């Protein structure tokens, strides 16, 4: 939904550009969950960025995500489940409230859809398996979250990275939000007349 990799890489390029050994990094060249390609940055630096208002102030939607989510909101409710810790989860919810939702009588909506945010504390849970998704579609870039989820339909999101290699081709891979829209339309067509999702 949002381009965290782009944001981290842009901030890294800003912060380290004056260093002698600096080489500008292209976000498309990030393939490691721990951002090992950012050779001058420590793991602590990356973690601090993920937990900083600066990161969320620079965070943008992925290409076409905002439009596709708006279109889907006419037919679907959203539960956004995200892993993190404090303050990361609080900042995520604040970003969503500012960029994704409208409030009507203290209930969050995007168009006519209900929007719910569920923060999963990474210190307490290693994945999202404790969240009941049995009546919905899980779109996730983490293979672990797909494997452990009870979601009715599962979409592996994003280009192949070291954290989402699906050697068994168990899941439909959507590399972008246009692909997601097409896959959801395909699911709706396959199950025409059935209540596929609540």
Question: Which role does the model predict for each range below?
Answer:
Residues 107-149:
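Conserved Lys-Pro-Asp/Glu-containing loop-to-beta segment of HAD-superfamily phosphomonoesterases
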Residues 77-79, 106, 137, 155:
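A structural signal for isolated positions on well-ordered beta-strands in alpha/beta enzyme cores
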Residues 51-80, 86-90:
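Short, acidic loop-to-helix structural element flanking the phosphoryl-transfer center
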Residues 1-44:
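Active-site neighborhood of HAD-like aspartate-dependent phosphohydrolases
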Residues 160-198:
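Charged phosphate-binding loop/patch that engages nucleotide di/tri-phosphates or the phosphate backbone
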Residues 137-175:
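Acidic, Mg2+-coordinating phosphoryl-transfer loop and its flanking beta/alpha structural elements
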């Amino acid at each position: 939904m949002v381009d965290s990799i782009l944001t981290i890489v842009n901030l890294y390029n800003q912060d380290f550009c004056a260093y002698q050994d600096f080489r500008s990094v292209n976000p498309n060249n990030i393939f490691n969950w721990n951002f090992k390609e950012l050779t001058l940055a420590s793991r602590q630096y990356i973690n601090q960025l993920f937990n900083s208002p600066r990161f969320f102030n620079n965070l943008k939607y992925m290409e076409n995500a905002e439009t596709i989510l708006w279109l889907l909101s006419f037919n679907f409710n959203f539960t956004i489940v995200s892993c993190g810790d404090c303050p990361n989860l609080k900042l995520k919810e604040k970003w969503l409230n500012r960029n994704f939702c409208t409030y009507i009588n203290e209930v969050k909506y995007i168009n006519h859809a209900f929007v719910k945010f569920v923060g999963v504390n990474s210190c307490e849970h290693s994945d999202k398996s404790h969240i009941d998704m049995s009546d919905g579609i899980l779109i996730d870039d983490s293979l672990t979250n797909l494997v452990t989820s009870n979601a009715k339909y599962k979409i592996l999101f994003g280009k192949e990275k070291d954290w989402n290699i699906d050697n068994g081709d168990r899941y439909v891979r959507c590399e972008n939000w246009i692909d997601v829209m097409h896959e959801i339309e395909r699911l709706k067509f396959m199950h025409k007349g059935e209540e596929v999702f609540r």
